[in-house]
């Protein structure tokens, strides 16, 4: 057996799977160490992928050559495009998944990836060489005493580092229910000088479908014409969808839950870690929104071949018997059987300001962090970090330049820049509001933004790149056709009337007609034979047609955001020396000197985004390093 590898990935969650798959596909001899080969990319919380901003991230992962979207498409139970009633920048794909099949598909993917090897064990300690000018990672020692060496190590340990689970007054060490915690790694990193902290997350009870009165619940169906998450033609949209169900709490439910507040580890000081602001427990909701008489919950199926349902919105660490009594007071759940109660978990993380934009640590060469160890929450955020860490660990090994996505290039770029530049004081999740350029960063154009880069890196196959080029050509052809084609007055009046649009009093270019919100290529193709002929001859897909339409309707906004982004790029091109002494610049505020010294931004653009660095401080840096 080989004990020497190019890259070692510690942890088989969503970040670890993407990191290992990317590194191995690029040619690195990669070892993935995981506690349980049956739980790759396990959906420890809700059985879904995507959602607001998260769906955009998954499409970006796919456009770069990651695997999450493809595996999601193969295991989708229900698909919805969220925010469809809003502008295209807000559209967010979400898929309900079969969690068992999702994990099994990831296992199949990993076991059939060339250059990738798997070792089932627990990492106990990271190994370092401190003899040189800078410390570097050299490998991993496992609980079984095996030492593996590598040029790079990617830590993707999720919630397992010194994890502690809580349910009421009961508590036990663990990374999640049924799995042990990982001890030793945090200590080995703290000894190297890494700052550590504690965070908290939680999950709701799982319910038995045989004991749920679905007739009393409001069904939530998927889209009538579902799309999918991957751009690849190798996957198909879901054919047979399973519904979710909407339920509500009540004052009676709330009163029952409050009887356990004195035994809540969140409220009695047992848990010190900070929980996710945007995914609060049910007891947090009752405290924060004490005046609300009901809260919305969603029952979500966990798979085709299981009776297990996930109660989204009811995360809790209250005593199990309190959860049990409260659940039985919810309409439709009066006789429900609980497979397992909700619980909270507290775990170690490392403030991400200790990272470079490549996700390599500043303290130790060759050591990368990805996922919840960086203070994030969510499968999608973790997978994105894992993908970039895997890419960059390989590229550094072979002497190639790092891949750093900018804030106007991808939500992934926003994610990593926020982590590295601003840090976190609570579990970080992505929202569209975090992106300054969300009109540029739409879910529909993730391939146009990133697939050429994915192909250049080596993760996009020739087949997928050829399909991408065909789509791009179709989009360009359709926009060009719209620009040069004139429509006579009265020629499409019947169609305009059918969509409540004003008739044309004079001829206009098709492009200008499409600027009206209610006008679509699909409807126009029924009354303009030349348009229908073009679409048929080129075999244009619905996605290509929709992309062309969005580019036309939003062109003004798109150009404005591009202009703003180009102006700000000038700041990104002004470098700051890595060893610059900020304390020597008395014209900077004390807070700015402290923050800049701690975070060590590489450019003035990054410095400008650090909380506590004012526009006046940025001007001082511009004077020093050149405008």
Question: Which ranges hold each PLM region?
Answer:
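Beta1/beta-strand and adjacent pyrophosphate-binding region of the FAD-binding site
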Residues: 2-15
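Conserved beta-strand-loop-beta-strand element in the redox core of flavoprotein oxidoreductases
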Residues: 127-147
């Amino acid at each position: 057996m080989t004990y020497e590898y190019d890259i070692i990935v510690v942890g088989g969650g969503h970040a670890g799977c993407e990191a290992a798959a990317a590194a191995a596909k690029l040619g690195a001899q990669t070892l993935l160490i995981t506690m349980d080969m049956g739980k790759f990319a396990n959906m420890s919380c809700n059985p879904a992928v995507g959602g607001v901003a998260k769906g955009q991230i998954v499409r970006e992962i796919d456009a770069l050559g990651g695997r999450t979207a493809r595996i999601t498409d193969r295991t989708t139970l229900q698909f919805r495009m969220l925010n469809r009633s809003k502008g295209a920048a807000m559209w967010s794909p979400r898929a309900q998944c079969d969690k068992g099949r999702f994990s099994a598909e990831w296992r199949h993917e990993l076991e059939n990836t060339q250059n990738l090897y798997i070792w089932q064990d627990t990492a106990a300690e990271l190994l370092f060489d401190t003899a040189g000018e800078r410390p570097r990672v050299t490998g991993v020692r496992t609980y079984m005493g095996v030492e593996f060496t590598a040029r790079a190590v990617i830590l993707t340990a999720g919630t397992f580092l010194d994890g502690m689970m809580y349910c009421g007054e009961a508590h036990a060490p663990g990374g999640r229910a049924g799995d042990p915690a990982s001890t030793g790694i945090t200590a080995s990193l703290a000894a190297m000088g890494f700052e550590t902290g504690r965070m908290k997350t939680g999950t709701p009870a799982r319910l038995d479908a045989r004991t749920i009165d679905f007739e009393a619940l409001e069904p939530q169906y998927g889209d009538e014409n579902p799309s999918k998450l991957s751009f690849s033609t190798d996957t198909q949209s879901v054919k047979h969808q399973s519904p979710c169900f909407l339920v509500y709490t009540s004052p009676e439910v709330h009163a029952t839950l409050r009887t356990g507040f004195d035994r809540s580890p969140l409220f009695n000081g047992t848990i010190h870690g900070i929980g996710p602001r945007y995914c609060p427990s049910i007891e947090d909701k009752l405290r924060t929104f004490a005046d609300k008489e009901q809260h919305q919950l969603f029952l979500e199926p966990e798979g085709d071949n299981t009776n297990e349902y996930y109660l989204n919105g009811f995360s809790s660490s209250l005593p199990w018997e309190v959860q049990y009594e409260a659940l039985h007071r919810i309409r439709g759940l009066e006789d429900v059987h609980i497979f397992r109660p909700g619980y909270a978990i507290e775990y170690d993380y490392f403030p991400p300001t200790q990272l470079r934009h490549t996700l390599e640590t500043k303290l130790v060469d060759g050591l990368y962090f990805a996922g919840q160890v960086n203070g994030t929450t969510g499968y999608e955020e973790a997978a994105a970090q894992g993908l970039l860490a895997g890419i960059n660990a390989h590229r550094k090994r072979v002497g190639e330049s790092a891949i750093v996505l900018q804030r106007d290039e991808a939500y992934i770029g926003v994610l990593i820049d926020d982590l590295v530049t601003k840090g976190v004081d609570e579990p970080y999740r992505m929202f569209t509001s975090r992106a300054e350029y969300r009109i540029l960063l739409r879910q529909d154009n993730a391939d146009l933004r990133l697939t050429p880069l994915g192909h250049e890196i080596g993760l996009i196959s020739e087949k997928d790149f050829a399909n991408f080029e065909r789509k791009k050509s179709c989009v360009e052809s359709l926009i060009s056709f719209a620009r040069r084609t004139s429509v006579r007055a009265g020629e499409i009046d019947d169609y305009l009337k059918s969509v409540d649009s004003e008739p044309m009093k004079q001829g206009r270019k098709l492009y200008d007609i499409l600027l009206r919100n209610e006008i679509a290529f699909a409807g126009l193709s029924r009354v303009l034979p030349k348009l229908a002929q073009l679409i048929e001859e080129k075999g244009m897909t619905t996605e290509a047609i929709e992309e062309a339409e969005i580019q036309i309707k939003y062109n003004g906004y798109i150009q404005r955001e591009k202009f703003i982004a180009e102006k700000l790029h000038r700041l990104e091109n002004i470098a700051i020396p890595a060893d610059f002494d900020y304390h020597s610049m008395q014209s900077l505020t004390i807070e700015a000197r402290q923050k800049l010294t701690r975070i060590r931004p590489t450019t003035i653009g990054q410095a400008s985004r650090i909380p506590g660095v004012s526009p006046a401080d940025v001007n001082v840096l511009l004077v020093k390093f050149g405008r």
